[in-house]
Amino acid sequence: MKFTLLSTAVALLTSTAVALPTSSSSAGSLLNERSYVNASSTATTCPYSRRSPAYCAGTAQNRTLSATYICGDSRLGPVVLPQFFLPLDPILDIYDRFGGLCPGAFLEKWFNQTGSGWWDYPPQNGFSVDDEGNIIAANLTLQTGTFVDRFGSEYGSFLAPAAAPYLQRSLPPSNLNGDAKFPWNYHVYSVIKPFAVLAGPIAPWFGQPGQGVQYQTYENVATLIADGYLKAEDPQRLVPRNY
């Protein structure tokens, strides 16, 4: 497998954080789908409102779960997204979870109904590629004191610079399904001991533009914690002290 590291990517890989808003003026409620159109979505928007019976066509609609998940289908993510809840509010700002599609059309495009029975994840582990199809990535050492995060369990092996916008991560909406302990499935970590990762820009996928930075680890997050490389942190540590 070939890897390409362009000079422009070098600067990208050295980024270890994305600035959070310093005021409460960022958009809060994401309960209505946005008309935001990005590089991997079409220029159309779903013609139905969430109140329309047609909105949930093509989903595993479950009315008993409709207050928890969109259309009562856990694949589509939670109904309620952060509103005035730092640091997650700005991370999810302008996020259009279905990339302009109706829920059923989104599942038809991105979910493998007949094969794996799960999401069709991007090739090359989600890294962007050059014009010849080579992965744009390089080994990078995360230094002590760096903050990273992820939307997902500790058994995964991908991290991102802390507070990077969700739309830059090219993740499916189900990654936002959390619980009382970890709202919206959000986990923050600090680097305790330096360790190497494969770092590079993220390809557009799941109707999202991507182009953030991802760190693919050589052990899963749970192992990195157990071995003393990462420490779980309260997400509130990302909120500016004078906020």
UniProtKB/Swiss-Prot annotation:
Region (Thump): 20-137
Induction conditions: Expression is up-regulated in mycelia grown in a zinc-deficient medium. Expression is strongly induced with the formation of aerial hyphae, accumulates in conidia and decreases very fast as the mature conidia germinate. Induced by the presence of proteins in the culture medium. Low concentrations of sucrose or glucose, Casamino acids or some amino acids such as methionine, cysteine, phenylalanine and tryptophan strongly repress the expression.
Annotated residues for binding of NAD(+): 151, 169
MF term (GO), any: NADP+ nucleosidase activity
Alphabetical UniProt keywords: Disulfide bond, Glycoprotein, Hydrolase, NAD, Secreted, Signal
PANTHER family: TNT DOMAIN-CONTAINING PROTEIN (PTHR42059:SF1)
Protein name: Conidial surface nicotinamide adenine dinucleotide glycohydrolase
